[in-house]
Curated annotation (Swiss-Prot):
Xref: CDD domains: IF2_eIF5B (cd01887), IF2_mtIF2_II (cd03702), mtIF2_IVc (cd03692)
Domain annotation tr-type G: ranges: 238-405
Protein name: Translation initiation factor IF-2
Keywords: Cytoplasm, GTP-binding, Initiation factor, Nucleotide-binding, Protein biosynthesis
Species: Pelagibacter ubique (strain HTCC1062)
Region described as G2: 272-276
Superkingdom classification of source: Bacteria
Sequence ranges of Basic and acidic residues compositional bias: 82-110
Family: Belongs to the TRAFAC class translation factor GTPase superfamily. Classic translation factor GTPase family. IF-2 subfamily.
Region (G5): 383-385
Amino acid sequence: MENKKTKLTLSGIAKKSIENIELAKTQSKNSVVIEKKPSKFAPRSSFTRPASVRSKPAVSTTSSFPPRTASVPKPASPITNDYEKRKLAEQRATRRLKGDTGKPETKKRELKLTVSRALSDEIEARSRSMASLKRAKLKENRELTKEEIQESLKPVKRDVNIPEAITVRELSNRMAEQSSNVIKHLFGMGVTVTINQTLAADTAEYLVKEFGHNPIRETKAEEIIQKIKESRSENLKNRPPIVTVMGHVDHGKTSVLDVLRSANVVSGEFGGITQHIGAYQIQHESNKLTFIDTPGHAAFTEMRARGSKLTDVVVLVVAADDGVKPQTIESIKHAKAANVPIVVAINKCDLPEADPQKIKNQLLEYELIAEDLSGDTLMVEISAKNKKNLDKLVESIVLQAEILDLKTDFESKATGIVLESKIDIGRGAVATVVVTSGTIKKGDFFVSGLKWGKVRALINDKGENVNEAPPSMPVEILGINGAAKSGDDFIVLDSEKEAKTLSQNRAEESKTGGSPLTFATQDSAFADKSAAELNIIVKSDVHGSAEAIKSAINQITHDEVKPKIILSDIGMVTETDVTLAKASNAALIAFNVKPSKEAKKLAENEKIVISSYNIIYEVLDYIKLRMSGLLAPDVQEKIIGTAQILEIFKVSGTGKVAGSKVTEGEITSGASARVVRDGAIIYTGKISTIFREKDQAKQVSNGQECGITLKDFIDFQKNDTIEAFSTTTTDRTV
């Protein structure tokens, strides 16, 4: 084949002429040689400007360089410049990254001449286009058999975890189903719900089966604790008693605690001791005792509300020179409410004005009878200052513990109670836990309230790292994922997955709140809440009046709310009563009595209302009023207009607009509205704007067409129904 030569002239790019390019085809079909023809103008470097001549020199028409031919390539001159060497190395590295091996390829695309390929020295590697990938995917799908296509269209059966309470939205997400389909299915069963409605576990399990999935019931914390108790062996061992020291702030409670700790140091077991946490252990002969500081009133009330029985013995400190004080009485009430035995320590017996017998007589009013008065309450006369009879006090505690016969399993999964929790810089969340059963070990996974974690470190009351914590031992635990609450339970579980799942379930249940919807409540869109309780504290002048008020209040009955008298006593309203009312959120009633100055001041600071009456009927009316405040209001709904969506439009600056026709009543801008699709309510909110022939309107009547926009909703579909309605709220009474 003869050599052929083709000329290609490119010009007009960026208003600059481009030199002629000569293409020479060699004998090989796949080789193309691109050359630049020599310019008929000499380069600028060939011009000379004499110094004596000011005018422009004549331009030479001959080229100063001879034309290069394709057949005789000019040998490359050696590169001596560092910059050129570095640039050449970068170009070679770029070609290697792009996969350019220097070998000629036979792709048709590379034979196509373009301007960029003509002017550049490198040929960039091209990646596969999206269109090419799409064509390959379609070709692959066409090759599938009919059976394979049907198999791919089958619904996926999933394992769905079901907690005790779950919202419709969350259940739909776990099943990977549309919320509207779930709501529609419930509506077909006669249950009207919203997307945020809470469903009971039984209802959710039924729905999961209806949609063809596999329901998995998640274990409740109570069931886990019960399994732990059932798995405990019969080889029970005695555990140290957990003792709480309570009393009035000026009666030497702190001094007794300090002396007990210092006595333990003198025993020679440790060279020094520092209380790092709010609880500690002491050694008395062969017995260990765990002491915890008096918790705050709110924390103690919270523990009682949770039904936890952390304290085994209460040591009540009473000053022999001062007698029974309000906080002393409060401590007695808390201990009796928790059904915990009391050991009385009559302190400051070294003072001349001390009268221990007077203290014993005062305690008779609160059913604390000393042994020398033919009672069963252990009372010890001590002096924290002189360290008098402290051994007798400890012996009395040990004796009371022996009577209680405190035993537990040391080898089972550990459980405990959180005393306090804090966020420590450098250590993160730290929880102080007292172990009630089992043994906590490093590496254990656990759940505490709504939190979970892995035990990274165990620190005892002396600041020492330990590997395990047996029953009744107080420890600081590092590794929790957040600050737990005082009174939260502490449960060791088998795995991280189990701990995380239980924590998430508890968090989900706390967020949903209220009673979940079951088929028993399918007539209402919202489930009836369990009966609320109104806590009541009654203080009266005489015992007979207190009993009469208590009896009359207990006769007030209602399906949704009930009264609960947590304290009925005689005497004026004290600071103790105000504190208890705040801790338990109770109504405080003073019948024929007045509050003390201290109680009145505390009530003002804590915003606690002290209601004073002298007629029983007025008390009952007040209780009914407070109970009525706990009832949900009666909401009456009236539909004022409906509209059918005919078309959906997109308007710039507004978004999606539902082109609708009013079929009944009137549609008013700003009115409450809901969207109904296939019988299921998918949205409830407000009407934002109404358009009438591109103008905004306040109201559209029956038979007219309009455009409607809703607040925070754009998922319109044809044939949806928009219902505008009004509600009237009426307070309910007991």
